[in-house]
């Protein structure tokens, strides 16, 4: 049981999202085994699209967002895969396109894991600053 987005003052905390929209998973698999680096980047971009859809639904408009503060990204990958930051660039590039290089880029962590619910390749949670 959880909420997709929780507001505290002018901050919005978004729960972890996968490359899913309307209950449909776009992509599954582990990067470095089932997916290439490029496919992992596309999966991270798809996670970004899912987050944008949640933001629009919960906030009413993306215009309510002032900036991205923090991204925590987890990449489902093999033990020897070490390019998690490059995978997560698929997400980061999308948010930079949507919100600009100043407001769409924040602090970021890109970590590895080797198992995810539904075998999704990437899960991302974010913290946003909202406009007054």
Regions found by a protein language model. Give the residues of each.
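Short, polar/acidic, helix-capping and beta-turn segments at strand->helix junctions
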Residues: 1-132
